[in-house]
Amino acid sequence: MIYITGDCHQDFERFNIDVFPEQKEMTKDDCVIICGDFGGVWNRNEESSREAKLMDWLENRPFTTLFVDGNHENFDRLYAYPVEKWHGGKVHKIRPSVIHLMRGQVFEIDGKSIFAFGGASSHDIAGGILEPDDPDFKKKKKKLDQGWYPYRVNHVSWWKQELPSEEEMQEGIENLAAHDNKVDFIVTHCCASST
């Protein structure tokens, strides 16, 4: 069985047994796919104790947790996990059954082919993106903190990798071509702004 949900932003309450009782009948062969903004890999430099508890809690659910990335992920840390093959595509395993589905990959899950392509452009950056090594960082941040415009800090709360690279797009095209450009499902965080 495959279940799909949206943004979690590190809030996994929806996976409590009281909220999601279907899991009583699930096994690790069953999957829950989060369509971006997983948020479980967020702390700046390393896994925090809170993240470790959350990831261990997800690992102990009876199902396998899968996610594509959104625009609110710590890509420095996410991309530091080893790349592995899983069900036909490339992944990062956060835990044995907490798995990041990498962009441009086709997975065979529960008899279905699934094309995964995460990422999105941040809409919450009207105030701009600050550089932490800017000599005027504190002054700029203080000014933005007093205003209404949301902003992000490069490699702290925003990463350019939120948008797919040319290589990821090309790999996606090649992987789709290898499947005759036919899959059962496409899992992404956000549709193109041109649609």
Regions found by a protein language model. Give the residues of each.
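Extreme N-terminal starter segment of soluble prokaryotic enzymes
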Residues: 1-3
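Core catalytic region of metal-dependent phosphoesterases/phosphodiesterases
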Residues: 5, 10-109
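Active-site-proximal loop/helix segment associated with metal-binding centers of metalloenzymes
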Residues: 96, 112-195
